[in-house]
From Swiss-Prot:
Source domain of life: Eukaryota
Protein function: Toxin that causes a rapid and irreversible paralysis when intrathoracically injected into insects (blowflies). Does not cause spontaneous nocifensive behaviors by intraplantar injection in mice. Exhibits hemolytic and cytotoxic activities on HEK293 cells.
Species whose genome carries this gene: Pogonomyrmex maricopa
Positions of modified residues (Valine amide): 66
Residues excised as propeptide: 26-37
Keywords tagged on the record: Amidation, Neurotoxin, Secreted, Signal, Toxin
Protein name: Myrmicitoxin(1)-Pm6a
Length: 67
């Protein structure tokens, strides 16, 4: 159960970071051209780390609830 909370927390953080990047791009038209490449590499790294952790955990919890 703790791992499920952790995976959901990390997912929420990941979504908030993406929303922040999108809001910055909308508010500043040239933001994508001038964007700090660090945030995009951080997003890629987060995605590579989170997806393999979250998907199996969520699938396992769903199987426990269903079956």
């Amino acid at each position: 159960m703790r791992s499920l909370y952790l995976s959901f927390s990390l997912t929420i953080i990941f979504v908030l970071v993406i929303m922040h990047a999108e809001a910055k791009a909308i508010s500043e038209p040239n933001a994508i051209a001038e964007a700090d490449p660090g945030i995009f590499s951080a997003l890629k790294t987060l995605g590579k780390i989170l997806l393999p952790v979250i998907l199996p955990t969520v699938a396992e919890k769903i199987k426990e609830k269903v079956g």
